[in-house]
Amino acid sequence: MSTVPLTLSEILELAKKTLLANGCDEENASILADTIMRAERDGSVSHGLFRLPAYVAGLKSKKINGKARPELENVAPSIIKVLGNNAVAPMVLSLGLPAVIDLAKKNGVAVLAIKNSHHMAALWPETEAIAEAGLVGIACTSYKPAVAPAGATKPLYGTNPISFAWPRPGKTPVVYDMATASMAMGEVQIAKREGHKVPLGTGLTKEGKETTDPGEIADGGVILPFGGYKGSSIAMMVELLAGALIGENFSFETAAKDNNDGGPPSGGEFIIAISPEKISGKGWDKHADEFFTKMSAMDGVRLPGERRHKNRLNKGPRNINEELVNKIKSLS
């Protein structure tokens, strides 16, 4: 695989230039480009420049409104709803996150329901932001069906990621962000592009047979849930929280309404912010740190998010797939 080194500034500039050339206004382009750059910076490459061609396809097909302004509504004392108006998720979150953080600090807990937005990307940026504000953050989202329920061979669920973040005053938060599938679809697609095999148990071919070929999974096959029935049940929970509970589509409904003319279809996200101080009182952070200290002292264990923060400290260039860079340059 040929790669080219790009600095973080070059990644940001390339993403923003491409978005501006394809229908985004300055604010939308700046916010989304920053999200893409941060994903590359932190090693979340399946949510970095890899996603840019799909965003452009969505802009060209008019699924994504590159000039959208989301609308916020306070629907109850601890519930906020944001209508995305076909904006990309980072634009919606720039409005919704500060509001849900303020509300959780005031009331102890707050819910943010996001509707009619496009591609929630990685979830850790929002839960990490919540944790950096001293709150516990939980988020989940669904997408087009790509995952079979346990025992099935056809897709019904999205990869349905969930993210959790725990605040650590004076330290980096503990954050995890994971698909409820055995592997995120973006990782399957990258493995296909780079000619890598995936572990047995990742997915099935379109004939319902196990395979280690990511191409057979991505092209008409299906991903399996992690942990069999356990992961399948968690994926079902995400469908309900990010679908029925907030008045958004289930994954299969999203697929039925998608005309496949390019780019990600719209969907929703469910976010909770909780104040540990309001619930536990003083000393909650020291108590939690005792647990993290115990955990870190065990051989072979690292806290969730440590690798991402280590990547973040590296200010040097990132090696980006050359074919991808050339493709992006052709879009602008």
What are these regions (language model features)?
Residues E73-I79, L95-A110, G203-G220:
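Residues forming anionic-ligand binding surfaces in small-molecule and nucleic-acid pockets
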Residues S2, L6, I11, A21, ...:
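Catalytic-core signal marking the mid-to-C-terminal active-site face
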Residues I79-P169:
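A generic, well-ordered mixed alpha/beta core segment in the N-terminal half of proteins
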Residues R193-F252, K257:
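Secondary-shell segments that build the walls of catalytic and ion/ligand-binding clefts
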Residues G48-I101:
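Active-site cofactor/substrate anionic-group-binding motifs, chiefly glycine-
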Residues V147-G215:
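Phosphate/diphosphate-binding glycine-rich loops and adjacent basic-rich segments that engage nucleotide
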Residues V4-L8, C24-F50, I64-V75, G263-S266, ...:
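N-terminal glycine-rich anion-binding loops that anchor highly charged ligand groups
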